[in-house]
Amino acid sequence: MSAQAAAATAAALQFKGRMITVTLLRLLSPSLEAVGRELDARLADGSGLLAGLPTVLDLEALGESAAGLELAALAATLRAHGVSLIGLRELPGEAGEALRTRAEAAGLAVLNVDGSRAAPRREVEVSPRPAAEPVRSLLVTQPVRSGQQVYARGGDLILTAPVSAGAEVMADGNIHVYAPLRGRAMAGVLGDSGARIFCQRLDCELVAVAGHYRLSEQISDAERAGPVQVRLEGESLVIEAL
């Protein structure tokens, strides 16, 4: 077979199932001018933005005023400030239906809470569910190396080996690391504000609980020393010694 023929028969696409980390950005003002000013300020002091990470916009706090947003202009403003906007978080009821139509016209996906694309609503018959099986914790005994991702769906994640820089560990519940923790660690990824992260040493690039995060440069040397736990207190992450 010639090289030209081989190229013609080779697959041009490959679909792979993989989770990615998504930042949820809550919009608190419908004013594009106000949004632009705050983004300028946050870029100037280097805080608040994770440049390059996929971002989903949450409009729930705007209430009825979300209906009047110019989505295309808003998306352009965010992208001009380095926010990699991929879509909007789904809103309930009629507001959500109207938002979906306008979002798709602006080239934005509408995503539900767990990050998958929202399906059109339809009436369904609800039948009793069987009793759910107990969720088991995920135990990982091998090092999690750079570029690898481990996700404990529906439960806690327990690691007995180091998590390297560039790696990512996630759990719907708590994360326990009986070794140095580097890379990124995210507990309560579906919104469990009671989730916690426990580790022998905190050297991570990012640590988050229920979507509230702190970057490496926002963690003091004192908070890195020795075994610690990370928990959410109100809207802030607390890192304290064990």
UniProtKB/Swiss-Prot annotation:
- Key word Cell cycle present in the record? yes
Transmembrane residue ranges = none
**InterPro entries tied to this protein:** CAP/MinC_C, MinC, MinC_C_sf, MinC_N, Septum_form_inhib_MinC_C
Superkingdom, according to UniProt? Bacteria
Which terms under GO biological process does the entry name?
cell morphogenesis; division septum assembly; regulation of cell division; regulation of cell septum assembly
Keyword terms of this UniProt record = Cell cycle, Cell division, Septation
Q: Describe the function of this protein.
A: Cell division inhibitor that blocks the formation of polar Z ring septums. Rapidly oscillates between the poles of the cell to destabilize FtsZ filaments that have formed before they mature into polar Z rings. Prevents FtsZ polymerization.
Family in the record: Belongs to the MinC family.
Subunit composition and interactions: Interacts with MinD and FtsZ.
Q: What is this protein called?
A: Probable septum site-determining protein MinC
Source organism of this protein record: Thioalkalivibrio sulfidiphilus (strain HL-EbGR7)
Q: What's the name of its gene?
A: minC
